[in-house]
């Protein structure tokens, strides 16, 4: 039986260089993550990890917040080098002194190594102490000119494998404008201009997932024309969302009550996008009127 390999990324570097954003990015990439892991506990922790999946992935922030960091890190890394079944890399995040000072001033935090309160003194001491670790690192990322989004994209490019690259997911949902626009929607489209099945007694109590309503909505010429334009707009931009490191794209289709037109459009959009992408379908307000009637 082939032994499963554990993939580990040790995230470290200068305070204020972006380790919090980095560890969140690794979580989005499918890694199990821990922030502020004491170096001395790392070998024991790896021994206790119960490997349930092929090629498990861990990303751990190990930095100077642990008081014993500088005295323990080298011995721990030497031990990891000799551990069977472990593939580990060190990601070192850095930034220019001027940028680090600006970030500390913006957050009004004090540097942990600035005994006299001068941020720059703490940065210089930390840089000196971390120099050997930086030289050992397989991946060094300078975040001076990077926004959080750009850092996420950089890490996705460096640490995504083929499986992770395909983990981009699309959520297609319907909703009713009368109940508010979904706050997590990335793209919102309004189909209230289309003929409304609500005004047909035989369709009023059905929804867009029911065939009579779906056919009524989608068989109108203006519906087909709009849908083709909608699909032509959405499909070409999906690779760009994936490339920038976005893990979930939420597309919301809205009509007045969220029961008929938007549901039908969301249903058809899911059918077409599912041919090439991982897509989930949801209808936020589809059954809202039914629930209201049942309460009365």
UniProtKB/Swiss-Prot annotation:
Keywords: ATP-binding, GTP-binding, Nucleotide-binding. It comes from the Bacteria. GTP binds at residues 63-66. ATP binds at residues 13-20. One of its GO terms (molecular function) is GTP binding. InterPro entries: P-loop_NTPase, RapZ-like, RapZ-like_N, RapZ_C. Displays ATPase and GTPase activities. NCBIfam families: PRK05416.1 (NF003828). Belongs to the RapZ-like family. This is Nucleotide-binding protein SPH_1680. It comes from Streptococcus pneumoniae (strain Hungary19A-6). The lineage of its organism: Bacteria, Bacillati, Bacillota, Bacilli, Lactobacillales.
